[in-house]
Swiss-Prot record:
Transmembrane segments: none annotated. GO terms for molecular function: DNA binding; structural constituent of chromatin. This protein is one of the two subunits of integration host factor, a specific DNA-binding protein that functions in genetic recombination as well as in transcriptional and translational control. HAMAP family: IHF_alpha. SMART domains: BHL. This is Integration host factor subunit alpha. Belongs to the bacterial histone-like protein family. CDD domains: IHF_A. It comes from the Bacteria. GO terms for biological process: DNA recombination; positive regulation of metabolic process; regulation of DNA-templated transcription; regulation of translation. It comes from Neisseria gonorrhoeae. GO terms for cellular component: cytosol. Keywords: DNA recombination, DNA-binding, Transcription, Transcription regulation, Translation regulation.
Amino acid sequence: MTLTKAELADILVDKVSNVTKNSAKEIVELFFEEIRSTLASGEEIKISGFGNFQLRDKPQRPGRNPKTGEEVPITARRVVTFHASQKLKGMVEHYY
């Protein structure tokens, strides 16, 4: 199962009183926009009980074109990583 932003908005409408569907959609969109902009500015995000979003700089490295076998460089880049908190890991393990 995949949880979409629309489904998150529906959950907000169901669980929080006096929240309209449009307000819930806006809240969800603002939440993710804040995460995007914070990461884009180079800052890390720590959500207690959930996990950490961290930025990692990966250096250039050699790669290979799978079709031709030709060596090509994979450019340096910045990636986002997520590390789940112990609490989240425990909850996931409990439900498995």
